[in-house]
Amino acid sequence: MQFSKMHGLGNDFMVIDGVTQNVYLTEEVIRKLADRHRGVGFDQLLLVEPPYDPELDFHYRIFNADGSEVAQCGNGARCFARFVTLKGLTNKQDIHVSTAKGKMVLTLKDEEKVRVNMGEPIWEPAQVPFTANKFEKNYILRTDLQTVLCGVVSMGNPHCVLQVEDINLTPVNELGPLLENHERFPERANIGFMQVVNRNHIKLRVFERGAGETQACGSGACGAVAVGIMQGVLDNNVQVDLPGGSLQIEWEGVGHPLYMTGDATHIYDGFIKL
């Protein structure tokens, strides 16, 4: 099976063309491939499939390192767009794809940057999904470590966002798993720790569902900015600094799609026998 290794700000992916080759992946196979010592190693595996709708170009599937399938990955979307172009699967500048929970438009800006229309943030608790009687800008969550105030949103996957004073002093790897698996998130959640520098600039660390802390999380950056705007602490165009690099997020507010712009880097091509 042929594949490419790619990354978006250090969030790394194994990308597989399921259009021109037959691909059958089980959770066990994905876990073996994800092993950084005995396999390829990655945060997520991205699978390019033919479209289910003639008006779309591709279907986009995402698998975490633990083998679980998820509906969204923003950094992966940028790498997906770069991959299908590099492999000659399309020559379009605007690439229309479906995911498990919706549709996206991926736009190639230059040799490195890709702009992604992430769709509208979803706030209704039942659709996140999150257990709450109604939408609120802030929720209180209690864990064995501490009680936190957070915002909750879906960008096609569930995000819980906490505002912190200093991300370097925050116990991300202790608090992250407790919130990821909190009983109020029936499908678990990605946990964002956001430090507001000013109204147009944040620093962010993300503990990803099924992957742990990663160098960057595109949908996490989108979720953090959306929560910050809803809570009134951020403006509509925000630079997000993650451990692996920076993203630019734009959102005009409720009723509008959210846009993410950032790098997508091809590392190497490979072949592996399953």
Curated annotation (Swiss-Prot):
InterPro entries: DAP_epimerase_AS, DAP_epimerase_DapF. One of its GO terms (cellular component) is cytosol. Keywords: Amino-acid biosynthesis, Cytoplasm, Isomerase, Lysine biosynthesis. Substrate binds at residues 11, 44, 64, 74-75, 157, 190, 208-209, 218-219. The active site is at 73 (proton donor), 217 (proton acceptor). PANTHER family: DIAMINOPIMELATE EPIMERASE, DIAMINOPIMELATE EPIMERASE, CHLOROPLASTIC. Homodimer. This is Diaminopimelate epimerase. It comes from Actinobacillus pleuropneumoniae serotype 5b (strain L20).
